[in-house]
């Protein structure tokens, strides 16, 4: 999920993004890009670093595989699909306008331009569908469910209101339109199963959650009332119990998605009677007042020591404990503990630097180096003899990659793979149709 793209980063950082299951973080820089593993609180493992492309403003990794998609300011209309372990380019593709965002899961790769969206089959990069004349979308706002069994795509259905268009990228058909907000959309996100969609408008005061694919409103949360903010990051926890939102302010909000009570036909208790009276009375109030009475507040918060910087947040489980991570455009990763029972103020337990050496800080103190067992990330990060990128020229919209490689099936699998086994990388050539 890319949350800091668009090329308007601060200093050396051009973009920030987590992979689909938030097990790694990617940063695009003036000098190239880096991938870090998020498997340990105490230290960051550098999975890969590349200086081949400069001014990288989009970098997306496919889960924990070796596949990464990169777009640079030098060629903003060209998408490059790379296999960083082998040091090769699988394919590249050029579009009619600048690429604003890219989303991918194990079935589909989505390329979003300002007024069109391209849907590719990720296994062979064949272009399956082009959504033309979509509402003007200057920030490339869109999201793709990571559950490949449904592959729902959501994008703005209007440039003037907060309408969400829901598209089935597997069956290549429109599902529904959700009137989510009165103001234009600022952020949208699916949960891990693709059964819920969260949205926020440019005002940034109210966050709503809808059921998918029917588009029924399930929850409504109020981030604040005093001021409008620019929400830059919106993400569910993997178990869909929490929803996290960060903005250009110093506060990150975590909302708890309480299990919705089943509506019984009859409830003769005093509380049930009062509840019915309350709901009946709210129907006579102005709509804005009635909505506010039914909105929930944040379950937990984080007070950042900065504001005004672009940042990306996520909720993960690291070393069996729930954590809230915030990556800032200044090049730092902040790790907080989240109390899943009581919520409240989250506690900062670690601060990592994403630029230069992978030093970590806790309350201003640097950690001493300690031996670390060899992991997948450490293995991938080992330097190799300067691999030259193989340039693959040409691409057919009907036939996919030309003289390139089909993306290996195991890169799309759920389980672990043997990345060093050459038998798992049979060179498959695709001929012209």
Curated annotation (Swiss-Prot):
UniProt keyword Repeat, yes or no: yes
Membrane topology designation: Peripheral membrane protein
Keyword field: Autophagy, Cytoplasm, Cytoplasmic vesicle, Cytoskeleton, Endosome, Golgi apparatus, Lipid-binding, Membrane, Repeat, WD repeat
rRNA-binding keyword on record: no
GO biological process: autophagosome assembly; autophagy of mitochondrion; cellular response to starvation; glycophagy; nucleophagy; pexophagy; positive regulation of autophagosome assembly; protein localization to phagophore assembly site
Motif (Nuclear receptor interaction): 127-132
Stretches that traverse the bilayer: none
An annotated GO cellular component: cytosol
Subcellular location: Golgi apparatus, trans-Golgi network; Endosome; Cytoplasmic vesicle, Clathrin-coated vesicle; Preautophagosomal structure membrane
Motif (L/FRRG motif): 221-224
One MF term in the entry's GO annotations: phosphatidylinositol-3,5-bisphosphate binding
PANTHER family the UniProt entry points to: WD-REPEAT PROTEIN INTERACTING WITH PHOSPHOINOSIDES WIPI -RELATED
Domain characteristics, as noted in the entry: The N-terminus might form a beta-propeller domain involved in specific binding to phosphatidylinositol 3,5-bisphosphate (PIP2), leading to the association of the protein to the membrane. Association to the membrane can also occur through binding to phosphatidylinositol 3-monophosphate (PI3P). The L/FRRG motif is required for recruitment to PtdIns3P.
Function: Component of the autophagy machinery that controls the major intracellular degradation process by which cytoplasmic materials are packaged into autophagosomes and delivered to lysosomes for degradation. Plays an important role in starvation- and calcium-mediated autophagy, as well as in mitophagy. Functions downstream of the ulk1 and PI3-kinases that produce phosphatidylinositol 3-phosphate (PtdIns3P) on membranes of the endoplasmic reticulum once activated.
Name listed for the protein in its UniProt record: WD repeat domain phosphoinositide-interacting protein 1
Organism: Xenopus laevis
């Amino acid at each position: 999920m890319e949350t800091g793209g668009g090329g308007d980063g601060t200093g050396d950082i051009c973009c920030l993004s987590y992979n689909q299951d938030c097990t790694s973080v990617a940063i695009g820089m003036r000098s190239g890009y880096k991938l870090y593993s998020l498997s340990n609180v105490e230290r960051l493992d550098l999975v890969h670093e590349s200086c081949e492309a400069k001014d990288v403003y989009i970098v997306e990794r496919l889960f924990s595989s070796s596949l990464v998609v990169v777009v640079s300011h030098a060629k903003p209309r060209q998408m490059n699909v790379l296999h960083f372990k082998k040091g090769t380019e699988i394919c590249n593709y050029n579009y009619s306008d600048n690429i604003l965002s890219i989303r991918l899961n194990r079935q589909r790769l989505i390329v979003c331009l300002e007024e069109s969206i391209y849907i590719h089959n990720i296994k062979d990069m064949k272009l399956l569908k082009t959504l033309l004349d979509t509402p003007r979308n200057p920030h490339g706002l869109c999201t793709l469910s990571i559950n490949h069994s449904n592959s729902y795509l959501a994008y703005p259905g209007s440039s003037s209101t907060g309408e969400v268009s829901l598209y089935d990228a597997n069956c290549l058909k429109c599902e529904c339109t959700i009137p989510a907000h009165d103001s234009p959309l600022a952020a949208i996100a699916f949960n891990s199963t693709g059964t819920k969609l969260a949205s926020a408008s440019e005002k940034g005061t109210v966050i709503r959650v809808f059921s998918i694919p029917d588009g029924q409103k399930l929850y409504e949360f109020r981030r604040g009332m005093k001021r409008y903010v620019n929400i830059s990051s919106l993400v569910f926890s993997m178990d869909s119990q929490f929803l996290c939102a960060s903005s250009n302010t110093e506060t990150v909000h975590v909302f708890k998605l309480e299990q919705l009570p089943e509506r019984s036909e009859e409830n003769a208790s005093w509380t049930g009677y009062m509840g019915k009276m309350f709901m009946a009375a709210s129907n006579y109030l102005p709509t804005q007042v009635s909505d506010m009475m039914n909105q929930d507040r944040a379950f937990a918060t984080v007070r950042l020591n900065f504001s005004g910087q672009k940042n990306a947040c996520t909720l993960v489980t690291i070393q069996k404990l729930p954590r809230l991570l915030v990556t800032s455009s200044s090049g730092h990763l902040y790790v907080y503990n989240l109390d899943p029972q009581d919520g409240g103020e989250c506690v900062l337990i670690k601060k990592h630097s994403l630029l230069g050496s992978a030093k970590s800080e806790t309350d201003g103190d640097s950690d001493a180096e300690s031996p670390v067992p060899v992991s997948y990330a450490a293995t991938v990060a080992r330097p190799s003899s300067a691999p030259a990128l193989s340039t693959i020229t040409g691409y057919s919209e009907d036939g996919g990659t030309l003289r390139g490689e089909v993306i290996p099936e195991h890169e799309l699998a759920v389980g672990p793979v043997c990345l060093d086994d050459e038998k798992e990388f049979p060179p498959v050539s695709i001929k012209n149709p």
